[in-house]
């Protein structure tokens, strides 16, 4: 599974500035999911890959990001 890393409290994606390979996105994807996950910056948000099938990614059901 893959998808955008999401903040559970706000419903917003984790933003990033450096497109492509991005240490911040790799670190955040691994912290949220597990060490074999990978991440990169796609469309200015962290995209995580190699996730388990039940991983929660953006968009969250019944939770909209306000103002972003």
From Swiss-Prot:
Main location (coarse class): secreted
GO cellular component: extracellular region
Domain LCN-type CS-alpha/beta: 1-66
Disulfide partners: 12-65, 16-41, 25-46, 29-48
PROSITE patterns reported in the protein's UniProt record: LCN_CSAB
Key words, A-Z: Amidation, Disulfide bond, Ion channel impairing toxin, Neurotoxin, Secreted, Toxin, Voltage-gated sodium channel impairing toxin
Highest rank taxon of the organism: Eukaryota
Entries under InterPro entries matching the protein: LCN-type_CS_alpha_beta_dom, Scorpion_toxin-like, Scorpion_toxin-like_sf, Scorpion_toxinL, Scorpion_toxinL/defensin
Positions carrying Lysine amide: 66
Compartments where found: Secreted
Tissue: Expressed by the venom gland.
Function: Beta toxins bind voltage-independently at site-4 of sodium channels (Nav) and shift the voltage of activation toward more negative potentials thereby affecting sodium channel activation and promoting spontaneous and repetitive firing. Inhibits sodium channels Nav1.4/SCN4A, Nav1.5/SCN5A and Nav1.6/SCN8A. Also has a weak inhibitory effect on Nav1.2/SCN2A. Is lethal to mice.
Protein family (similarity comment): Belongs to the long (4 C-C) scorpion toxin superfamily. Sodium channel inhibitor family. Beta subfamily.
Protein name: Beta-toxin Cl13
Biological source species: Centruroides limpidus (Mexican scorpion)
């Amino acid at each position: 599974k893959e998808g955008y890393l999401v903040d559970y409290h706000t419903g917003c994606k984790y933003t990033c500035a450096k497109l492509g390979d991005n240490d911040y996105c790799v670190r955040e994807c691994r912290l949220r999911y597990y060490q074999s996950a990978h991440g990169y910056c796609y469309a200015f948000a962290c995209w995580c890959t190699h996730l388990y099938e039940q991983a929660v990614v953006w968009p969250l059901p019944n939770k909209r990001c306000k103002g972003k």
